[in-house]
């Protein structure tokens, strides 16, 4: 066989570089798992797995693109190769059969690929592309229809929680009671806000033709608010409150 051309040598060099990158990324993952105590964080493992996946994809694409060349090339030692001192490396280079474990992986992959090609009911590439375009939008809409933070789904609430076999019914009733209390608190706050907007300062009998009482109102001023605050009890410093909570010592009278 003739000597390989420069283009063929370039393909072999690219194959070597990709395999070296894959080997290093796998070695880095194995080393981090064996040496780290505790184990690496999930984000670190996910990052390393992503790097390995990209390296595998790069090697697979390169081997597929140059399958004809790599299948036709034959390795043989030259006269200057140190066969006595590098016998183990020479055996690996001249090995024509895969490792038994690798042969099993290759056989399973080929069987899976053949069964996928024989499946006539499988989706075509166009149908798969349409499915991937439809799935994210539909999944997002379905997620928005769900009540992820509650004890029951929206469908179970619509059908009635008394018909649900499983679930924390008592917790749900407490949740509903809490919601009612929150609504009452909001109404009270709104009522207090309205009271603050208009304050009754006097009552008198109406002088017009209608019977009844009349009310004199006024908008509260900052001065009146300060007077109300002055009428309240003394303010306890935060340090005294913390001291009382931790040691039980009563705050000093001021």
UniProtKB/Swiss-Prot annotation:
GO terms for cellular component: core mediator complex; mediator complex. It comes from the Eukaryota. Residues 167-234 are annotated as: Disordered. Residues 173-199 have a biased composition (Acidic residues). The keyword Nucleus applies. The keyword Nucleus applies. Residues 154-190 form a coiled coil. Belongs to the Mediator complex subunit 8 family. This is Mediator of RNA polymerase II transcription subunit 8. The gene is med8.
């Amino acid at each position: 066989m003739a000597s390989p051309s420069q283009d063929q040598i370039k393909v072999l060099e690219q194959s070597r570089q990709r395999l070296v990158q894959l080997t290093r990324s796998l070695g880095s993952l194995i080393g981090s798992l064996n040496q780290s105590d505790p184990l690496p964080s999930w984000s670190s493992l996910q990052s390393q797995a992503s790097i390995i996946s990209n390296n595998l994809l790069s090697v697979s694409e390169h081997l597929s693109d140059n399958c004809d060349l790599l299948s036709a090339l034959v390795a043989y030692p030259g006269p200057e190769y140190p066969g006595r001192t590098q016998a183990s490396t020479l055996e690996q280079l001249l090995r024509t059969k895969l490792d038994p474990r690798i042969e099993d992986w290759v056989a399973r992959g080929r069987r899976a690929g053949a069964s996928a090609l024989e499946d006539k009911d499988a989706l075509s590439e166009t149908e798969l592309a349409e499915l991937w375009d439809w799935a994210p939008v539909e999944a997002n809409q379905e997620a928005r229809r769900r009540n992820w933070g509650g004890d029951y789904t929206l469908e179970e609430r619509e059908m009635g929680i008394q018909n649900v076999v499983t679930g924390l019914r008592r917790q749900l009733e407490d949740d509903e009671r809490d919601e009612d209390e929150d609504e009452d608190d909001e109404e009270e706050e709104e009522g207090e806000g309205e009271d603050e907007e208009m304050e009754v300062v006097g009552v008198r009998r109406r002088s017009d033709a209608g019977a009844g009482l009349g009310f004199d109102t006024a908008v509260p001023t900052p001065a009146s608010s300060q007077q109300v605050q002055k009428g309240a009890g003394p303010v306890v410093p935060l340090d005294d409150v913390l001291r009382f909570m931790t040691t039980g010592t009563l705050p000093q009278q001021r």
